[in-house]
Structure formats: C-alpha cells, structure tokens
C-alpha cells in the first residue's frame, strides 16, 4: 500500500464503499467533484445516495470492476503507458478488506495506488482546519454534536462521522469553510496518522481485542495521536487520559477537579439534561441538551471546550447543543406502539451497555420494565470481556440475548452466545437466550407488554428486527380499530 493521496483529479475507487467510514469519505470526495466509484456486496440506502450524486457503484467485488478504468492505449510491451497509468484510480480499502479479495488483487496487478481508508481521512484532515474526535466510547455522538454546533453557529463545516445524523441526512456533509470535523477511529491503530488542529479524546479503555492484546498498546496509539494534535482536549474523568495524556484543555463532570470546564447543578429529566457550565472557575451559563445520561453531558462538555477554543460565545454554543437530536442508533427512538417504547443503540462494549441501560432507567417511568435485547459483536470481544458483559445488565429487568454476530471473524469454537447468556444469568435472574433474529422477534411478540421500554443493543444487524416487531404490534391495533 501507498499512503500518498492525489487530489489533482485522479479517480477514487472504494472497495466496500457502503461501510459507514468509507461512504463518508466517498461522499465528501464526490461532492468535491472528484470521480468516485466503488463496490459493495450489500447495496443499501447509503450506496443509493452515493449513486445519486454521481458515484458509480458495482454490486460485486471482482477484478472486472477495475476494467472500467483500464486505459485503451498500451505500448508495444503491453504495459500501461505512463500517461495513461496516471489516470488509473486510487483504490481505497479498509481493514475489513482481505488481501485475497479479487478486486484488491486486481488493483495491485493493474498498478493502481492502493491506500487505506485512514490515509484518505488523514489527507483531508491535513487539508482543513480540522477537529478530530477520538476515544473508545462517545466518538460518534461527540463529533456529530460538534459538527452540528458549528453548523448552527454559521461556520459551515465539512463533517465525517461514524453514524447517520438527521440534520445532514447521512454520515457526512461538505461545507464551504476551512473547518472539518471528523471521527477518528482507533480500532486498527490507524489513529496515529491523524494530525488535527484540535484533537479530542473522550476516554480510553481496552477494546478491539482482535487488534490489541493489552490496554498499554491502546494507550500507545492514543499517545501518538495526542502528540500530533496542536491542541488536545480531553476528559480527566478518565484516569488514563488525565495521567498519561495530560491534555492541553481538560473537562470534567466533577466540579471539585482542576479541569478547565466543569458543571454543577446537573438535572436529568425524561426530556433531557441541564447543567451549569463553568470555565476556569467562571460560570458561563446553563447548558440544555435533549440527550440523557452522564456520558452525553460529558460529550456536550467536550463540544463546549471546542467551541470556546474556536472563539465562539457560549450563547452560540449552547443554542446548537440544545437543538442537537443525536445520531442514529445512539439511543434512537424508533417508535412507540401499544404503550411499548422501542429504542435502538449501537452499544456493544460492556461499558457502553452499562451507561446506556443507566440512561434507559433514567428515562423509564415508575414501574416501567427495561427490556435489553443484546446481540454480542465479534467472538474476540465476547470472549475477552465475558466477565464484564456479565456485570453490565444490572439496570435491565429482562435480558434477551442472541448468538454472536461475527463481523467477519472466524468462529474458533471458544465462545457462544449461549455461554454468555449463562454468565449473565449468574448475575441476573431474568435472562433468555434466543439465538436467531426470527426467534428474537417471535419471543418479543409474546413477551413485551404495554409500558415496556425495549432497548435493542449491538453493532451488528439486530436493529433489522425492530421494524418487524413494531409492524407486528401494529396489526392487532388495526384489526380492532
């Protein structure tokens, strides 16, 4: 692979263009009028959107896709002439693409420059006044909130995030200003390539055991990223961030710390959260947000710190945060039918599950059941955090567990969803194992009752059953109306 990105007009071709990170890059490049194409085995609304702005999408990943670009002029040795070789596309891959992928191999044989997704993001970050959000948890919400805040303040940023946001109807937007807000992913170690003007680190924990063996390895990656940031903003509520990274600007939910930004008078309500924000000992004003829970208040405080670093008045910051509705699949309300509330959340790490269920408990009315439906994500993560997962469901009244979503990992026979269910059952009296999505759907139709808050958790495809369950609950209502 190379790491040099050509922005002179050379085409970009993405293998796996429908992925959340890949599609964001493809969208911004297409909107900047670069020729963009890509392949994906599972065309979806994201690939359809890319087609609508001029991207050419292939429904298969095969060598013939790159024949689309093969120049017609060859020299006598049947080699690509220099002037035509320069017109070959830059082929972009993510870590998910195997080196045995036929399209990937064809790109190498044809002589295309092959780049990792992170190389393109790093080049865009270098091309703008960039704000990059990193951390084990909270990246998507924090980066989306910062992007929305800057948009509402009239700064018209370019935004690339790891989730879809209703405000810009997708996971990316192209602005016309110098500002870029990006979510910076640590999962494969490529975080070290980014050198933004402002970097944010929300927290650091061990995750992605398919790539990291120890927390120390994760810390090394974040330390390298931190050194590349001209200004580093970090939450000192995370001891690792506080002690090992020593951010330039700090924030904390605890007013008795020496953080630059703190809060007091925190009030959690069913319709959101309010708090009084302090800047280096001086009260800035009241911050209101529609999102619940301590972790979202912490995310909002990071956004305040960014806004102030950019010179925004607190009033403009607070106005943007107050109207931010969140990203999709981040405690997203999917519907309310027959007195049952359906919420979709991307949580797939024990810490994320714990705080998400705590937020659900805050929102639940007295006597309302919190039903957690969880699809474990990756065998390696499930095995590594088996004990932690078992202790993460204390705020749920009922836990429904599916089999493990592999996310492309091989099943080595070391762990199953049923084993995880048994571990959770040691800590929780109401645990049910339903291995498949159809069996989950059938069980929920028999079990959910008016007043329940049904929370679907996981980074896999569990959320696909939500419309089916909602529709099924609607049918009896139609029949009796």
Swiss-Prot record:
Pathway: Cell wall biogenesis; peptidoglycan biosynthesis. It comes from Nostoc punctiforme (strain ATCC 29133 / PCC 73102). Belongs to the MurCDEF family. Pfam families: Mur_ligase, Mur_ligase_C, Mur_ligase_M. ATP binds at residues 135-141. This is UDP-N-acetylmuramate--L-alanine ligase. It is an enzyme of class 6 (ligase). Its EC number is 6.3.2.8. The lineage of its organism: Bacteria, Bacillati, Cyanobacteriota, Cyanophyceae, Nostocales. Keywords: ATP-binding, Cell cycle, Cell division, Cell shape, Cell wall biogenesis/degradation, Cytoplasm, Ligase, Nucleotide-binding, Peptidoglycan synthesis. GO terms for cellular component: cytoplasm. It catalyses: UDP-N-acetyl-alpha-D-muramate + L-alanine + ATP = UDP-N-acetyl-alpha-D-muramoyl-L-alanine + ADP + phosphate + H(+). GO terms for molecular function: ATP binding; UDP-N-acetylmuramate-L-alanine ligase activity. It comes from the Bacteria. It is found in: Cytoplasm. GO terms for biological process: cell division; cell wall organization; peptidoglycan biosynthetic process; regulation of cell shape.
